[in-house]
Amino acid sequence: MALISNLKDEYDHPTKTDPDTNPKIVADIISSKEPPQPSQDVAEERSRTDWDLKEMHEFLEGDEAKSEEILRLYQSIERDPILQTRPEQFDYTKNEERESVALRINQMSKYLETEPYEKFRRRLQLMTVNDPSLGIRMLVNIGLFLNCIRGNGTQKQYDFWAKTKEAGKVKQLLRLFRYDELGHGFNVAGCEIFATFDEKTDQFIIDTPHIGATKWWIGGAAHSATHTVCYARLIVKDIDYGVKTFVVPLRDSTHNLLPGVAIGDIGPKLGRQGVDNGWIQFTEVRIPRFFMLQRWCKVDRQGNVTLPPLEQLSYISLLEGRVGMATDSYRIGARYTTIALRYAVARRQFSKGDGQPETKLIDYTLHQRRLLPYLALTYLAALGTDKLERQHDQLLKNLDKALATNNKLLLKNTIQSTKSMFVDSGSLKSTLTWLASDLINEARQSCGGHGYSAYNGFGKTYGDWAVQCTWEGDNNVLGMSAGKTIIKTVQQVLNGKQLKDSTLEFLNDAPALSSAKKAVIRIKSHVDDTDRVLKAIAGLISKYAKDLIPVSYQSWDSIGPQRVVLSKFRCHYYLLETFNERLNDRIKAKSPARPHLENIIKLYYVTNVLGPFIDEFLRFGVISPSVAKYITTEYPQKLCAAIRPYVIGLTDSFQQPDNFINSLIGRYDGNVYTNYLTNVTNVNDPTNYKAPYSEALEAMLNRASLEERERFEKSKAVAAKLSQ
């Protein structure tokens, strides 16, 4: 004990000694300063959590059963040696990433065989957040491909491809789905590949007429897929019947390309290098007539074409991807707000002087304003996307039931629900993927230099995420489409129509809202009233849309930007309405979680809706100018200050484990510096201090002088000799 005491005394009161005569004192040899203790800061803030994390997680996920399933799946994925994450995965080359994805597809297919599809779908959704390349490759195969056949094919066609050919188990065949062409993207109706019916042989001839019709961005085409659902123009007896869907084989049983099929890799991308995106050209490729999906449009042996009135339902297969990407926005937001806020508590920067400790990042006003609105957005997105998923699932069940029983009333109501679903999914997909992209970038910047490290996840995720804004419907195109429907809906209501069985029923109040002279939000206390804020958003949508109706008669294109804005309003109304209803239904007034959730919902609509769109609210007289400053400046910071002490508990409520978060500075224990350095040195061997390109560096550093390399031919001595 005496030795420890002496060492402690030297530590606390170091004295100068002669290391040559007395080199035993540690304080004379190494620094004895106290290292930073970020884990203590995180633990202390975690202790402030005064609500039940289980209750909060169930609130976010929708119910106890879903919450339990999510947590069990997190555990299952973390224990699986193929599916679990590792820091070294951030160092993978393109080929290594594709190999990793192939191994994971193989592993995931085994779960597909052994667990209910709904559970597997949830597993795949979670995996997609960490490995988007895996997610899109499997979702294309069992989601888009099978849903396209389910939505466009007959029952016999679905049974054959999904069951007989085992597409539903990712066996025998590996399929892809894409309508993109080199010269056309989201404009499905503009596809130019031909599917010409040959009556003599009872076959369709699939042909790429020119370079612009080359299928492009086809995930899985370059090396993997055996079949594709091809969107092509149906040509029968020289008549163009528009774009239909066809199953076209690409490779034979030995995985070689079939005659007439040309395929190549499109090369590196901004992200998702694990997907072998390719191009496809068809040269008079023949397929049997029954390879055309004929649930709606039918072509018989004699070339007679039947076009049923419900053919618009054939596009319903596109909805699942949009719903999935909206949900991904919630989980990706939860992941990166957790990382950024844990780091903001653990990291200290700059001191106020007088020996005071450095200040936590999260205690800076600006840092709170940068991150806490995104935390609030993530909470609202959790509930909104859960509702959207359930809405989509119910729509598919109703459609199947209506068609199977020939229930015309149910079918009519389902068609009406489908129209709402296109608006809702388009609005949420576009708005939330845009906001999630901003969230990732802002969270990265808030972590300073360490946010730039690949091992903290931001860089790869941003590259992988960016495509969410431009595929499965470019966000601007989706926004314009949803906005157009909203304008038409408001016009119909103003003309006397009442909406039924529609999520847009709140627009039935458009006549009163659009003609209201008095502002909805007039004093500060009104900003605290969520129901009033909902009325304000509905009022803005009504007035905004009514104002655009006369212009729409002249040109829809000229109001494209305003249509996108309307779709954003629709998204925010949907999120706010859903959160408000569940808060009032599920969380009791005396629940410890309630005041925190009330602050969250207020911060959400103040910083994501009222503030960003204050000009529109003022222009249409929905908000009084006297409260504008309060909304944009004073109230947001008041709410941030109320939420700030509980940021660790609020992010813990997402219940995402370290293996899922996969960020060295975002781990649960908050020990950011030890975690960071330990893992970096484990992945990058510090004994490899000579680079593979060291020879080039050494050649530069050790090169001979310029005079020597010029053989001294320009030296004074040579000049003296030659000048004589």
Curated annotation (Swiss-Prot):
Intracellular or extracellular location(s): Peroxisome
GO biological process: fatty acid beta-oxidation using acyl-CoA oxidase; lipid homeostasis
Keywords in alphabetical order: FAD, Fatty acid metabolism, Flavoprotein, Lipid metabolism, Oxidoreductase, Peroxisome
Enzyme Commission no: 1.3.3.6
Organism domain of life: Eukaryota
Enzyme class, first EC level, given as a word: oxidoreductase
Disordered: region residues: 1-23
GO cellular component: peroxisome
Main subcellular location: other
Segments of skewed composition (Basic and acidic residues): 7-21
KW Oxidoreductase (keyword) present: yes
InterPro entries: ACOX_C_alpha1, Acyl-CoA_ox_N, Acyl-CoA_Oxase/DH_mid-dom, Acyl-CoA_Oxase/DH_mid-dom_sf, Acyl-CoA_oxidase, Acyl-CoA_oxidase_C, AcylCo_DH-like_C, AcylCoA_DH/ox_N_sf
Molecular function, one GO term: FAD binding
Listed pathway(s): Lipid metabolism; peroxisomal fatty acid beta-oxidation
Catalytic reaction list: a 2,3-saturated acyl-CoA + O2 = a (2E)-enoyl-CoA + H2O2
Cofactor(s) of this protein: FAD
Entry's family note: Belongs to the acyl-CoA oxidase family.
Annotated protein name in UniProt: Acyl-coenzyme A oxidase 2
UniProt gene name: POX2
